Amino acid sequence: DLQTIYEQIFNGHVERFDKKAKECAPFIVSASIGLIDKVAAKFLPTSVRFTYFWTMREMTNLFQNMCLAKDKYYGTGDSLAKLWCHECRRVLADRLITIDETKIIDDMIGECHADHLKKQGVSADVHLNDEEHANIFTTFTAVEPDGAYRPIDDLAQLSKVLEAKLVEYNESNAMMDLVLFDD
């Protein structure tokens, strides 16, 4: 079953992690399965919403990026839960069409977090609908050169890094004129 498959994958990845982080792995898997089941039941494909076709690919994408976490930075179940919230939003909500649908996904993530992780004492402490305290992870703004998948603490700093990367790209490639926005 899916629980066994993804639990084996994720347990293998978090094997070197702190004991508390390892203990939350099965609950992250069950929360993921529960969330994707809820999303698939709520957001059915239509002719307008043809991207609302949910498969195991979403689970695979979610755990592919969860497995970018390094034990050096994710020593607690709480930090893994925060990454899980980010990945769920990225993998699932990025395919949605309206902001209202994104808010529904955020609520579903919160419910699955409460049902599967909070009961185990694991708290992500994220504000999913709060743009001021965005829960964003990336590999390219870390100070360390190891390319670690880390949370963004400062959105202004993220904006500066993205603008610098765009300038760097434009110096060696065809000009790309992008507008960065918060959504």
Where are these regions (language model features)?
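Alpha-helical lid/collar subdomain of P-loop NTPases
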Residues: D1-D183
